[in-house]
Amino acid sequence: MVAQNNQQNKDETKGIKSYYCSKIEELEIKVNEKAQDLRRLEAQRNELNNRVRMLKEELQLLTNPGSHVAEVVKLMGKNKVLVKVNPEGKFVVDIDPTVDIAKLTPSTRAALKHESYTLHRILPNKIDPLVSLMKVEKIPDSTYDMVGGLDKQIKEIKEVIELPIKHPELFESLGIAQPKGVLLYGPPGTGKTLLARAVAHHTDCTFIRVSGSELVQKYIGEGSRMVRELFIMAREHAPSIIFMDEIDSIGSSRGESGSGGGDSEVQRTMLELLNQLDGFESTKNIKVLMCTNRIDILDPALLRPGRIDRKIEFPNPGDAGRLDILKIHSRKMNLTRGINLKKISDKMNGASGAELKAVCTEAGMYALRERRVHVSQEDFEMAVSKVMKKDSEQNMSINKLWK
């Protein structure tokens, strides 16, 4: 009887123990769930607090009065600076301790507090978007191997553009100033722009291309401002090459008397260009490359040494040059055997490089028209006759016009 009671007590104890163990496990699971919920809610609280803080900061910025934009004129001691605010005038203001005084150079844009006029921030230079678009992001893929018949011109442009950028110590050892600008002149289609792209490829520097007509603006002062911002951008991205194509559109000779407001604005743009050419040092790794077909109408002030240090002529190619250009442009063409490029070159006496390229393209068009995949000698001869023929309609007599 006693043994039976002991067994019954053991069973009851075991049952109670298992019951409490199961309850403890359930409570532990609930505690873990509550702890996870608590951590999630804490994370949400932190996120909301951060958002509230950001909104408060944004609200504070929105409620603060705006800053004045000023231009630094010069430093006036350790903690003072003379600035120019348009249209109010010039002021001597304090400098905030957080501002690096070494960066406060003349013509630097800065922000002044609305009430105290304390200089508290340095602003980036203001560049016209049209000027920023002149900067070529992708380096041109043209190389010197793609230029034919211009060995002398390549050598001269290497000496004044590529050599000072890559090896400035050579000029310092000789004690001579680096050339600033180069003028490429010659008939149309002789490879001036092509050689400029090749120079940009081999120097591996910032290439800024601008046409002279882009600097002729409608409103007074716009062209001069674009020229100033163009050179500012060139200084910021040095070493750089400024390539000005068709410079005769703004660099023509000045007459004794102005012939109109448009000509006066063009002359103001050219005067600003002359000022910028005189203003920057030749050691700043900024080279100016100008290109024109009409050197005879350029102003002598633009052509003088110190602004344009070298003038490189690009004549029409000679016999050997024409053959080299034909070989370059026909290098990737699918030609039949026995093509005599020398014979084709002899038929194009006086042709420019652009006309030689047009002959290769036109020969391919003749083969394409006849559904062939090879270009023959006859295709080249027909292309020469088409490209080099004279426009007889310009020399028609009056009798022929009235037939």
UniProtKB/Swiss-Prot annotation:
Top-level taxon in the UniProt lineage: Eukaryota
Matches recorded under Pfam families: AAA, AAA_lid_3, Prot_ATP_ID_OB_C
Localization terms from the record: Cytoplasm; Nucleus
Any GO CC annotation of this UniProt entry: proteasome regulatory particle, base subcomplex
Name of this protein: 26S proteasome regulatory subunit 8
Disulfide bonds: none
Biological role: The 26S proteasome is involved in the ATP-dependent degradation of ubiquitinated proteins. The regulatory (or ATPase) complex confers ATP dependency and substrate specificity to the 26S complex.
Transmembrane segments: none
Stored InterPro entries: 26S_Proteasome_ATPase, AAA+_ATPase, AAA_lid_3, ATPase_AAA_core, ATPase_AAA_CS, NA-bd_OB-fold, P-loop_NTPase, Prot_ATP_ID_OB_2nd
PROSITE patterns named in the record: AAA
Keyword Repeat part of the UniProt annotation: no
